[in-house]
């Protein structure tokens, strides 16, 4: 991991001023520092998983919990009825900029379809 990738570890340990909106033993969710929508939340596992390709039999429940928490946050933010987007990027060509598995929850306005 390089310094850019370590930022998520610092957020989990609350070593930054990042606004954490949810944290449990499995995941941490926080507001994106450069939001692409009125609501832009990042959900990460509390243990290091590099990419979607690294989800396996042992850690697949972590991924399911990430998705569950993203939906729970969407409901709490009152965007679940109007709609929201969950985005995950994998590796360089997939647009992943930080080498740490993370999920973007975007909403609060009409979002453009990717396809």
UniProtKB/Swiss-Prot annotation:
| InterPro entries membership | Histidine_triad_CS, Histidine_triad_HIT, HIT-like, HIT-like_sf
Q: Where is the HIT domain?
A: 7-115
Give any Pfam family that matches.
Answer: HIT
Task: Tell me which domain of life the UniProt entry assigns to the organism this sequence originates from.
Answer: Bacteria
* Listed PANTHER family: HISTIDINE TRIAD HIT PROTEIN (PTHR23089)
Q: Which GO terms describe its molecular function?
A: catalytic activity
Name it.
Uncharacterized HIT-like protein BUsg_345
Species of origin reads Buchnera aphidicola subsp. Schizaphis graminum (strain Sg)
């Amino acid at each position: 991991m390089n310094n850019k990738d370590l930022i998520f570890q610092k957020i989990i340990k609350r070593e930054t001023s990042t606004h954490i909106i949810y944290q449990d033993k499995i995941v941490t969710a926080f507001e994106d520092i450069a939001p692409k929508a009125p609501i832009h939340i990042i959900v990460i596992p509390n243990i290091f998983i590099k990419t979607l390709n690294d989800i396996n039999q042992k850690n697949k429940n972590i991924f399911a919990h990430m998705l569950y928490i993203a939906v729970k946050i969407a409901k709490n933010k009152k965007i679940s009825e109007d709609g929201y987007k969950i985005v995950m990027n994998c590796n360089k060509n997939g647009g992943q900029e930080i080498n740490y598995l993370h999920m973007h929850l975007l909403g609060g306005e009409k979002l453009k379809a990717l396809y």
